[in-house]
Swiss-Prot record:
Name of protein: Small ribosomal subunit protein uS3
Reported function: Binds the lower part of the 30S subunit head. Binds mRNA in the 70S ribosome, positioning it for translation.
Subunit annotation: Part of the 30S ribosomal subunit. Forms a tight complex with proteins S10 and S14.
Record domain KH type-2: where: 39-108
Keywords: Ribonucleoprotein, Ribosomal protein, RNA-binding, rRNA-binding
Similarity comment: family membership: Belongs to the universal ribosomal protein uS3 family.
Biased composition, class Low complexity, residue ranges: 215-227
Transmembrane segments: none
Biased composition (Basic and acidic residues): 238-247
Keyword Ribosomal protein: yes
Amino acid sequence: MGQKVHPIGLRLGIIRDHRSRWFAKAGEYPALLAEDHKIRAYIVKKLASGGIADVDIERKADQVEITIRTARPGVVVGRGGAGIDELKANLEKLIGRRQIRINVVEVQRVDAEAALIAEYIVGQLERRVAFRRAVRQAIQRAQRAGVQGIKVMVAGRLNGAEIARSEWTREGRIPLHTLRADIDYAYKIAQTTYGTLGVKVWIFRGEILPGAGGPAAAPEEVAAQPKPDQRPRRRKKIQYEERTDEQ
């Protein structure tokens, strides 16, 4: 089942944390869930050039706290904080909430984030770069960032072919069945002249060992953890005794 389910959803509560953290009454859950979707969609669309890796949302009474993980904090904050003020005002109009707090967190290892790698591939495909070249360059960037494995799948009318197909490339290990494996996953859509292309990216950043880190541990903490002993075990020698049939 590790090959079929969402890699992040499978690890929720084990090594990953939820992107939306709040509780509400039974009748309010659908409206608040739709509100979270609107917030994320607006931020991703408004800050398309900001390299948004993830958006976390927390709710406390009437206050909504939004944490934006981005590769370009300067684009999000703007000159003198003007970008944050404008974003906050627009979100208040969108959801009708009075108190909105926005935190901006810079991503340390940009090329170790699946969302940013997928966004890079989408940008190359929309500029009519050959998909194999775009995938190869993305894999090289991820390997330079120190990831232990990466898998990229592109589907659609590749290079303008009449029949749609899917191709994938993998470098390193992607242990989808291992729950302690820190695997990041992202899915993006590229709008090309021949139609839409789907891009999926899996990145294996290492294992989170028991006691070494909790849910949503940073990639830097995962990389600093010691690797388990991988020395091959010696097989025990079996002694055989020669037996002769004596009459």
